[in-house]
Structures are given as C-alpha cells and as structure tokens.
Regions:
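Beta-strand repeat architectures
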Residues: 1-14, 22-93, 100-114, 122-179
C-alpha cells in the first residue's frame, strides 16, 4: 500500500511474509518484527520511547530515509540480517537509536545518513553510495569492518565515511574499492 503504516500499542506485531510497502512506516510503540526479507520503500521513523523496536528477525530488510530513535528507545535489532538503508539524493537522515545484532548495515542512496548512537552490531558496515556520518564517538562498533565501495566517482556522487567534527571513531578494518 501507499498510505502511512503506524504501529501503536506495546505488543509485538510480526509481519509474517516478505512485504513490499511503499508508504511511510512510523513505529510509535511496541515492536515491529519483519517475518521475511522485505522492503519498506518509504521513510521509516522510530519514536524515542521505551520498548520501540524494529526487529529484522534475522531477515534482510530495505528501508528508505531511516530516522528517529533515541536514548529512551527506538532501536533496531538486526539478528543475523542485513539492514539496507537508502537515503534519497539531497536528503539528510539522522538515526539516534542503537542498531544491534550480528548482522550488517549497508548504506545506499546519494543522501547522507548520520548515526548518532553507539551502535553494537558486529556484522560490519558497507557504504556503497552517499555519506555515512559518525555523529557521536564510536557510532560504529570499534572492532567492526567498514567497506567504502563505490562504482561512481563523479562530482557529488560516490561513497564517503565522514567523522563529524569533535568526534572520533575506532575501526577494526577499513577497506575501499571503486569501479
């Protein structure tokens, strides 16, 4: 569908099949668990509220323009899955929740994504397009692998890891490639 999907109530809602949903997703309370490899084709916003969780259930999930989260809640549990975050060209998304699990994160799209929490996921980070900005000390797990991999090096495109002014980041391994 194309309308806004809002998750309310403290219970867990599990979407049991792979889904492709093109409207915005807002998680205001409780947990939304993905039951299969899925695509949330529009913005995904998590409230800064205790108990608010997007749980990938170990699946690979595509989201666009991730935002929200915070010190009280609004976290993402990867399990062993891969979270693919696409930020549209010209957009600047900020996520302040914690991303945890053994899975990995892939940053796509030519916009920027700022991670503003000390994330604990261990599966590594791949930046294939746009900018991923470290907006807090060690936003990426210090033992994790980071790959900056781009097939385009045109003006204003490509892939970039940015450590924002005043912050530091320890990286387990850093590698890059271009096409």
């Amino acid at each position: 569908g194309t309308g806004t999907f809002t998750k309310a109530g403290s219970n867990t809602l599990t979407l049991s099949n792979s889904i492709i949903f093109s409207g915005p997703v807002v998680i205001n309370a409780g947990s939304l668990t993905m039951g299969g490899d899925s695509g949330l084709q529009n913005s995904v916003s998590l409230a800064n509220t205790s108990g608010v969780i997007l749980n990938l259930g170990g699946n690979d999930v595509f989201v666009r323009n991730l935002s929200g989260g915070g010190t009280s809640g609004g976290n993402i549990v990867l399990g062993s899955g891969e979270l693919i975050i696409d930020t549209v060209s010209g957009s600047n998304a900020t996520f302040t929740g914690v991303i945890s699990g053994t899975g990995s994160v892939v940053k796509k799209g030519y916009g920027s994504l700022t991670l503003a929490a000390a994330n604990t996921y261990t599966g590594g980070t791949t930046i294939s397009e746009g900018s991923m900005i470290v907006g807090i000390n060690n936003a990426l797990k210090s033992t994790g692998a980071v790959v900056v991999s781009s097939t385009e090096f045109n003006s204003g495109s490509g892939a970039v890891l940015v450590i924002a002014d005043g912050f530091s980041q320890t990286i387990g391994t850093l590698s890059g490639s271009s096409g």
